[in-house]
């Protein structure tokens, strides 16, 4: 699904899915999943959003908003705690895209997109795989660890939450420790 926020359809399309408009991204994905299920192309048990980096917001929030709609989720080097993201090494450059916690409107937008802050007790979440490179300079690996721990703590069904950390990788594409140093 080409959800709003991507660059596929130009700048207006991109702006329709950034900052306070970020909820459009996961609402578009949810609408696409509902359409495919309603038309009989698939069932929820076969649907699995996958997103990496900022796409972790898309995957994480689609599942925290509609866990019943998906059989699994994959979050790769995902930005999953948008509230704390600004405090990380790469946080300030992301303010233009996501907003800032230093003003009320920005904080509300970041809270809306923060998957970690929408994980609730008693909800049956689908199976989850979170992957992260330990040397990631863009999205700190603690985000995936924190999200995995939260899902494991609240998810009482038999669906597993798995975390894979690659100690020789960064933000994808082979950022080894040697390359970072």
Predicted regions span which residues?
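Active-site-proximal cap/loop segments of hydrolase catalytic domains
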Residues: 1-181
